[in-house]
From Swiss-Prot:
GO terms for biological process: 'de novo' pyrimidine nucleobase biosynthetic process; 'de novo' UMP biosynthetic process. One of its GO terms (molecular function) is dihydroorotate dehydrogenase (quinone) activity. Keywords: Cell membrane, Flavoprotein, FMN, Membrane, Oxidoreductase, Pyrimidine biosynthesis. It comes from the Bacteria. This is Dihydroorotate dehydrogenase (quinone). It is an enzyme of class 1 (oxidoreductase). It is found in: Cell membrane. Binds 1 FMN per subunit. One of its GO terms (cellular component) is plasma membrane. Catalyzes the conversion of dihydroorotate to orotate with quinone as electron acceptor. NCBIfam families: PRK05286.2-1, PRK05286.2-5, pyrD_sub2. Pathway: Pyrimidine metabolism; UMP biosynthesis via de novo pathway; orotate from (S)-dihydroorotate (quinone route): step 1/1.
Amino acid sequence: MMYRVLRRALFLAPAERVHVWVFALLRAVTWAAPLRAALARLLAPRDPILASTVFGVHFPGPLGLAAGFDKNGRGLAAWGALGFGYAEVGTVTAQPQPGNPAPRLFRLPDDHALLNRMGFNNEGAGALAQRLTRGKSDIPIGVNIGKTKVTPAEEAVADYVTSARLLNSLASFVVVNVSSPNTPGLRDLQAVAALRPILAAVKAETTKPVLVKIAPDLSDSDIDEIADLAVELGLAGIVATNTTVSRDGLLTPGVADLGPGGISGRPVARRSAEVLRRLYRRVGDKLVLISVGGIETADDAWERIVSGASLLQGYTGFIYGGGLWAKHIHDGIAGRLRACGFTTLSEAVGSAVR
């Protein structure tokens, strides 16, 4: 209830400005080790039933912070203390870039959603590498890499490889982002003919698990082709899904006036869940599936786990849910695991579709 009141006040200011304020506050309150430890005792996932080892990495809890919130790895120490089981930083590109002009982030409160056209604004993979070298985190940190906007499509492979080379030794896993709608031509790289050389080259460059992040707007046949390619190349998994360009069924007035961008949150939940189930039926346990998109409650999280997700991610749910959101999700998952007779998280993964 308190956060709802605070959220109403925060929502009076422009979304990106509030993001800067809140992110600075989160870093400040977790900067000192004693305070960070105290927060972790209250919020961090400590129930052993939530822990799992996925693609060789130990995760204390399945819910992670999705890419986009901490683009440059400035909050590495914060996320474990705030209850997340891991965090994915980025998206970063080989070269620093400013992203698209502001305003570029909007709230859709009637839809519990966000619309963004950030355009991969970031300080570059080199700057993130330096920060990861200096920083400390109590949880796994994955990195999400994208294509520099000015890099032509025919040079995309080299662009992704540059980022992978810089970040390889510093990340717990690497996610290749070819699915943001906010970089011109990026989603064209999801076509298997274009995607194959990118994924193969990144995998050859890094010793860490490599995953690919896909869009919810792909056709079912395209999803199947990417899944088959990921298995063929020996990828660790797929992150499903990114934001949607669809405007179907939105309730917030004036959305058309906000312009282009990708929508996250509740409107993408149904399609993200559909894509997850399709992927799990296609690949089973051959790939790790990370589900992201419209997860708001423990019931949502549980549905994704039993539908095949080994790990989960959230961003918009965190914005609307507040600082206790990750803890509430993890506590709910633990309760459902025990209520359903599971002794480990991995036993529950895909149990509804097997």
